[in-house]
A protein has these predicted regions:
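A short acidic, Gly/Pro-enriched loop at the edge of an enzyme's catalytic core
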Residues: 135-150
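Conserved class I S-adenosyl-L-methionine
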Residues: 74-84, 100
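Conserved SAM-binding loop of SAM-dependent methyltransferases across substrates and taxa
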Residues: 85-96
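S-adenosyl-L-methionine
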Residues: 111-136
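A short glycine-rich, Lys/Arg-flanked "PGG" loop and its adjoining helix->strand segment in the class I
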Residues: 165-178
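N-terminal auxiliary segments of SAM/dcSAM-dependent transferases
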Residues: 1-41, 52
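Conserved beta-strand signature within the Rossmann-like core of class I S-adenosyl-L-methionine
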Residues: 179-186
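Core SAM-dependent methyltransferase catalytic element
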Residues: 200-201, 205-233
């Protein structure tokens, strides 16, 4: 059995490749000037192939970098918010963590998303049991101060509206134990996330990555003892 973690934003990846095909066809038929036609077509093809490469190979190694920077240790209680096919949750469980995961299972955000795909990947990787929940990041069914580490990868930007995104962050904060760590990996709105967390008493550190598609950042946030947040660059 092989792991299949799906294609991130599949309509975007194949959309880029389709646009590249249209530019190539338009150039061959003389509709588009050759220089601009081939150049633009090649650019869209590169974007589409990069998205596919990230989804199929790069993110498999990138997940370990996220977990390492998050300070994951065996026996930690970990929550993966927006787990999808289990990319981070399964890797965390393999490293000895007690993992729970939650998702609303959107096929638009991740191809083939669902519980069945999650379970197939967990079995393929030989990971121990993971508690799986259905639900939204803005309204999670967990008691306050439950987890040592809360992680979220390429999820929060998919939530529409600033207030709703902050509701999701507030929920992650709510279920985090005192002294716990919140790790948010995303492709945009990072200054909003950082500002919200620092205003709520977290010390943050931000990491940038240029091998992901799109380029991404990771915020590692820990509540400061005095409850006043700040940023460490």
């Amino acid at each position: 059995m092989t792991t299949r973690y799906g294609i991130d934003a599949p309509y975007g990846a194949f959309g880029f490749i389709f646009v590249a095909f249209l530019y190539g066809a338009g150039t061959l038929w003389g509709i588009i000037p050759p220089f601009w036609g081939w150049l633009t077509g090649a650019w869209f093809l590169l974007l589409g192939l990069w998205m596919l490469l990230y989804s199929m190979t790069i993110k498999l190694s990138h997940r370990h970098r996220i977990l390492a920077l998050s300070g994951l240790k065996p026996n930690m209680k970990v929550l993966d918010v927006g787990t999808g096919r289990g990319l981070l949750a399964i890797a965390a469980a393999q490293k000895g963590a007690d993992v729970s995961a939650i998702d609303k299972w959107s096929g638009w955000d991740l191809g083939g998303n669902g519980r069945e795909a999650f379970d197939k990947n967990r079995l393929a990787e030989g990971a121990p049991g993971i508690d799986l929940y259905d639900g939204l990041a803005q309204d999670m069914p967990f008691p306050d101060e439950t987890f040592d580490l809360v992680i979220s990868h390429f999820v929060v930007h998919n939530i529409s509206g600033r207030k709703e995104r902050e509701r999701a962050l507030a929920e992650m904060v709510r279920v985090l134990r005192p002294g716990g760590t919140l790790a948010v990996s995303d492709i945009k709105n990072m200054s909003q996330y950082r500002k919200f967390l620092e205003e709520n008493g977290f010390q943050t550190r931000t990491y940038s990555f240029y091998h992901t598609f799109p380029f991404s950042k990771l915020i590692i946030a820990v509540r400061t003892p005095v409850g006043t947040g700040c940023s460490i660059c």
